[in-house]
Regions:
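Short intrinsically disordered terminal tails
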Residues: 1, 125-127
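Short amphipathic alpha-helix that is part of the acyltransferase structural core
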Residues: 1-27
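Active-site rim helix/loop that mediates acceptor-substrate recognition in acyltransferases
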Residues: 21-40
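Conserved donor-binding loop and adjoining core beta-sheet/short helix segment
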Residues: 37-74
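Short secondary-structure junctions
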Residues: 42, 109-116
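Short glycine/proline-enriched coil/turn segments at helix->beta-strand junctions
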Residues: 45-49, 89-92, 114
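Acyl-donor binding region in acyl/amide transferases
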Residues: 61-110
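Conserved catalytic-core motifs of GNAT/GCN5-like acyltransferases
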Residues: 114-125
Length: 127
């Protein structure tokens, strides 16, 4: 059976994206497939990496949110102009991405990026 193109690409990109979801334990792969299939998330498939994009709607702002990115960091950084173009075409006001602590060093070197907030988490299982 021939799979739709998005499904074929998502399957190919699983090796790049799954580690992100495994690290935070927020979604399993079936959740990822369902959100892409339903059009909630959009796959930006690159040769050696991938990103999942979500559009967030606030009362006064529309945000392109990079939910997950994995694979070649160099390739992801080079895709910045593509992400900007997607955001502009969808009339977004800004782009947001969460990253590992080390990503702050990379973002500081890129034009236009600034640190918005710091997130902390605590498992209630440990309390």
């Amino acid at each position: 059976m021939l799979l739709p193109k998005w499904q074929t690409e998502l399957k190919r990109c699983k090796k790049f994206l799954l580690p992100v979801f495994n690290k935070f334990d927020t979604y399993n792969w079936e959740d990822v497939e369902e959100n892409v299939r339903k059009g909630r998330w959009f796959l930006l498939a690159l040769p050696n990496s991938a990103m999942l994009i979500e559009f967030l709607e606030y009362p006064r702002k529309r945000v392109l949110y990079v939910l997950a990115a994995g694979g070649s960091l160099e390739e992801i950084i080079k895709a910045e102009s593509d992400v900007i173009s997607i955001g502009e075409s969808r009339e977004c006001d800004s782009i947001e991405i969460r990253g590992r602590l080390g990503f702050e060093k990379i973002a500081k070197k890129r034009k236009g990026w600034k640190k918005q907030y710091t997130a902390f988490s605590m498992s209630l299982k440990d309390v």
